[in-house]
């Protein structure tokens, strides 16, 4: 029996069909939050179901061809072709069954902070913001700046953005599936605009990423008593006030000390809601990292943080070179990468992660 060889795939198919029935019910259709959660799980199971159905089809066709092979040479030839095809289809199914990061289909919150290097570091942080914005545009994602602290020269001291996909993407197409590899220290080597002697300077910016929680995510519960909320005026370049009302929000989670600033929305109420969602996202990421550590899941730990205190990438302007130090990826198209052509760099991280997961599965 097919389900005896791949019981997990058979179970996935049953769940997939059950979810399709639920998503068609009026109760779910009228509940956007529930529909989104079911849609995410449906997309997550889709790759397994497609691979399983393809494997079942080849198995059935092979059995039928073998039955007729003794009577017809064409069927014998077809049986041989299907026998050659079966191992590849089976390998695709085994790969699809390897557990993915459960957050892959989620959207992403990203923080970019200027590090060592003064104004040059802030300018580089601004370059990273533009790079990720253009990359997101190429992927058809939206970018929402939630808070930003800029310098007079146009640099970025720190910025927080939400990167979101349209609809409910398959896990491999989710924002987190790609952006989770960006967390870490990014180093730049170039001649700063403020350098009169033409000397190359090294500076850095830090990137923190975490999957965005749903507004009604019941995995994380926050007691209002654990929150300290400060209200202030939004600030623009150089710290200048950009409005005359106190609509910006600083939300502090007292048990963990996590602080979230939100000033992008038009009203204090909207900023409170947005800040709470970001706080939930950070607590969710913290919870998942703790669970991974307790389970000694080294793959998940590597993917989730890749040690954010370490340098992960170097951007060398004089040589137009970019290097990813985790995968040894190197290319001489830095100008294109900074214009959003980032996929090849990210793919090197995805491929290394998939190879690691496959090795751990065997």
Swiss-Prot record:
Its annotated compartments are:
Cytoplasm
Mark the residues carrying the PTM N5-methylglutamine: 240
The source organism is Bifidobacterium longum (strain DJO10A)
The task this protein performs is described as: Peptide chain release factor 1 directs the termination of translation in response to the peptide chain termination codons UAG and UAA.
What family does the database annotate?
Belongs to the prokaryotic/mitochondrial release factor family.
Gene Ontology terms, MF aspect: translation release factor activity, codon specific
In terms of superkingdom, the source organism counts as Bacteria
Pfam families given for it? PCRF, RF-1
Database matches in InterPro entries: PCRF, Pep_chain_release_fac_I, Pep_chain_release_fac_I_sf, Prokaryotic/Mito_RF, RF-1
Task: Reproduce the UniProt comment on modification after translation.
Answer: Methylated by PrmC. Methylation increases the termination efficiency of RF1.
Q: Which SMART domains match?
A: PCRF
Q: Where are the transmembrane segments?
A: none
The protein's name in its UniProt record? Peptide chain release factor 1
- Provide the Gene Ontology terms for cellular component: cytoplasm
Principal localisation: cytoplasm
- Recite the UniProt keywords alphabetically: Cytoplasm, Methylation, Protein biosynthesis
